[in-house]
Amino acid sequence: MLNEFPIFDYEDIQLIPNKCVIKSRAEADTSVTLGNHTFKLPVVPANMQTILDENVAEQLAKGGYFYIMHRFDEAGRIPFIKRMHDQGLIASISVGVKDYEYDFVRQLKTDAPEYITIDIAHGHADSVISMIQHIKKELPDTFVIAGNVGTPEAVRELENAGADATKVGIGPGKVCITKVKTGFGTGGWQLAALRWCAKAARKPIIADGGIRTHGDIAKSIRFGASMVMIGSLFAGHIESPGKTIEVDGEQFKEYYGSASQYQKGAYKNVEGKRILLPAKGHLQDTLTEMEQDLQSAISYAGGRQVADLKHVDYVIVKNSIWNGDASH
């Protein structure tokens, strides 16, 4: 039962260092394998319209990073798969659960993507289970990620239906207001929810939402994630598709949630909002910094690879990690 677990989030946790066994952090291996492919980092940019478009997806794939293309350009998905496969790159797309998506999956038989993510806000649903089974029947070699969920029961059901990985996180993201609009979700206790779900999982978990710092990646791995999906830290780059807006001479980029009126084009069942982020530099600079910070984390863990983060001790420091420094 959940009540047996302490409830905490990222800022409440500090990992405890172990003796370092490598000469330099550059020796630490940050790569991770998901399905049949190995990627440079256990990190994937959120499959949102203001985070990536086809060009960003291509850049990530060429660089050896995992990506998941969003599902908001439905007609463009088959040409996108072809574009990636023509260059010898992996194709990784998203689908919903509406009736027409069943026909779409059948159309993929001639050129199946390596990864499909079933992407809906409340993934513990009969509609998701049915879509997992459909994809597994039509495209048995495609790796299926299903979500989003927030309970061990949901993880078990989606895995039993055939999902190869589950995505955990209901509304902890910076531009998600599910917790406010509905009263439900993992906002404020996402890391504890991840831990709770990971104890039931037999297959990989992707932690999705609530990541505010690079250290949160290491914490996610510690509490059971194989991969970490990140939105806001990947938004606002030069390559990011979001609109650039100037305010008082400063450049900002827009970042909005996948269930916002900005993405939907209509104010109906809205569970996302829009924010402006100060424009950042190049995406590759952030990826490089993430890799270096994760290498440092592995060295603090006394390890050589990502999996070594899973065994470190931790302490719960209720909201004191920033010592009153709210700038973070």
Curated annotation (Swiss-Prot):
Q: Which residues bind NADP(+)?
A: 205-228
One GO biological process from the UniProt record?
purine nucleotide metabolic process
What is the reaction catalyzed? IMP + NH4(+) + NADP(+) = GMP + NADPH + 2 H(+)
Q: Which GO terms describe its molecular function?
A: GMP reductase activity
Give EC number(s), comma-separated: 1.7.1.7
Catalytic positions are: C176 (thioimidate intermediate)
Q: Which Pfam families match?
A: IMPDH (PF00478)
Report whether Metal-binding shows up as a keyword of the record. Answer: no
Q: In this entry, which stretches build a coiled coil?
A: none
Q: Where is it found, in Gene Ontology cellular component terms?
A: cytosol; GMP reductase complex
Q: Which UniProt keywords apply?
A: NADP, Oxidoreductase
* Enzyme class, UniProt record, top EC level: oxidoreductase
Question: InterPro entries in the record, alphabetically?
Answer: Aldolase_TIM (IPR013785), GMP_reductase (IPR050139), GuaC_type_2 (IPR005994), IMP_DH/GMP_Rdtase_CS (IPR015875), IMP_DH_GMPRt (IPR001093)
Q: What does this protein do?
A: Catalyzes the irreversible NADPH-dependent deamination of GMP to IMP. It functions in the conversion of nucleobase, nucleoside and nucleotide derivatives of G to A nucleotides, and in maintaining the intracellular balance of A and G nucleotides.
- Tell me which family the UniProt entry assigns to this protein: Belongs to the IMPDH/GMPR family. GuaC type 2 subfamily.
Q: What is this protein called?
A: GMP reductase
